[in-house]
Amino acid sequence: MKKTGIFLYAFYLIICTFCGLSFPLLRENINYLYLFIPAFIVLNLFVGVFSAKMPSLRLRVCRHGALLLAVFLPSACVAVIHHVVLAFKMIPGDWKNWLWHALFAFGFYFVIFWNGIICVYLTSAQLGIRQRAIGLICGLIPVANVFCLVSIIKTTLREVKFEAEKEEINRARSDERVCATKYPILLVHGVCFRDSKIFNYWGRIPRELERNGARVFYGNHHSASSVAFCGEELAERIREIVRETGAEKVNIIAHSKGGLDCRYAIAKCGVSDLVASLTTINSPHRGCQYADTLLTVIPNQVQDKVATTYNKAMRHLGDISPDFLTAMSNLTASYCAELALELDDAVEKHGIYRQSVGSIMGSAKSAGFPLNYFYLIVKDFDGPNDGLVSDKSFEFGEKFTLLTPKTRRGISHMDVIDMVKMDVPDFDVREFYVDLVRDLRERGL
């Protein structure tokens, strides 16, 4: 924390403690209200709100709430100790006066706490449902509530600090347009998801790339269908982007099954001359061994029921001919082995720059459902994995980058595309993609 920040925090802490313990002064001289009311207003409305480094109102409000809670906790502890000591002096002889002291302090800190907690609960992107729920459950449990509050304060202060630093980085390099590649970027989603304006599959990544000069487009293909069907869709989408932008080619960044779909589009659908580069992210190029087994042991009627339900739902969301079972079978190790024989030489001979990225989780606790369960299944079959795909299946192209865990959390199949917009310790996913696209730019692509 910088010196200015420490000074402001100490200033707010003093104001908060003064107000919380000011009942005797107000009782003796009502004119102290002229100090109390402005101090109360400053604490509840202006702490942390005015910051030029905060890129949005949401983060300014989050910072306000986090600082308010950070001030509340030590100040409230001082107030509790003060009133316990006071109780020994005033009870039983002057218990009514002590009660008024305590009620005044309780009312003051009640407002401060709820102001802070409501602000962070409504605006923090990093608290998550689990941490919010634990906070609500433990709120009335002594000692546990203090630990929960400390955790909430740490999470939200870390969030606003991180976002402020990112804003500073982006402002400093805004003129460089480090992601302004020669050819536009095409982001291709994986299986069981669709491109949507409401929910962005790629989280905060597209906005970060665009802010740094990139032109970003989406695949807009089926959520689940065969590699061949999706490949045809993507080939048409590539032609559409080329016509729309006037660019000669596109740079493709594809996640999961999207990597297989793009390889097929390049090799089989006549768009090899329209693709400058292909970057696959956690794609199962050698398939998933556990998928072969699951499709064998799960009864056909169960598979058909799941597929029918999924396909029906996806038709309502815009897919014309979803095919869940074929999509799943195209992720098996046996199918991908056959596919590789067809596609590898075809993609390589067109002179397209090819690279791949993979990541692995540290443990089953590294991600939520269903990746936490699949991590254990995949580990039994194939060893280290990202919750869905084994590390043995990622590598493709001239360059391979394996993102290994620097902490026990690791990086999951969803973390690597920022799907849930949760920051991963020691891995800035947005900056990773900025560097990825910057490298394409430096290669003249």
Identify the function of each model-found stretch.
Residues 186, 217, 277-279, 355-357, ...:
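Hydrophobic/aromatic beta-strand patches that form the interior of the parallel beta-sheet core
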Residues 177-249:
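Active-site catalytic motif of lipid deacylating hydrolases and related acyltransferases
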Residues 199-200, 288-294, 365-370:
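Short aromatic-enriched loop/helix-cap "lid" or pocket-rim segments at secondary-structure transitions
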Residues 32, 98-106, 134-137, 348-445:
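C-terminal catalytic-base region of ester-bond hydrolases, centering on the histidine
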Residues 2-9, 19-32, 189, 216, ...:
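Serine-dependent carboxylesterase/thioesterase catalytic core
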Residues 326-345, 434-444:
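A Trp-anchored, charged/polar loop motif used as the substrate-binding/catalytic surface
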Residues 1-198:
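Flexible, membrane-associating and regulatory peripheral segments of lipid-active enzymes
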Residues 158-183, 192-194, 201-204, 208-211, ...:
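N-terminal topogenic membrane-targeting module
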